[in-house]
Amino acid sequence: MRNLKVMMAYRGTNYHGFQRQENALTVQEVVEEKVSSVLNEKVIINGCSRTDTGVHANNYCFSVLTESRIPPLNFVRGVNGRLPDDISILSCEEVPEDFHARFSCKAKEYIYKIHNSESKNPFETDLSYHYRRPLDAELIRKAAEKFVGTHDFCAFSSDCSDKKTTIRTIYYFNIEIAGDSVKILVKGDGFLYNMIRIM
């Protein structure tokens, strides 16, 4: 049995998040179908994280166990040749069998983009949130600094009941502004349910 670690990128506009759901098209469903086709066996991919409807991913990791001997480069080419234009496999490598995309994950980074202008930018409609009123960058930065470090984040989750611990570490919470474009970057060792959204 081989274990493959795969990195991919996707534009989430047309999908109801990553995780497979009944009666809704998801990234996992599409990718599993194409990966199974290339490996010539029915497989389940293990994603590093759930993403919500419409969320995009730049570097998303998944792992898959397979009996196939396909070389990693052939895997990348084969799957990319079958995927729609809004999903792309970036790389593939063989890893130890105990590697799991979710449980072996050391950190996650989220990027939120805001188009801060009176007028919408039609080229950014599904890539950034349009906010008309002026933002106080300094106030946002001061608030963001409070989250950095190791804290109990239960108050910033909509459900803490099934977690062994609600302690998480935020490595950075940065605000970058360039003209009308505001980028919020948050990196942590993990996030509770809805934690990133509530923060």
Residue ranges and their predicted role:
Residues 1-199:
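Structured-RNA-binding interfaces characteristic of tRNA pseudouridine synthases
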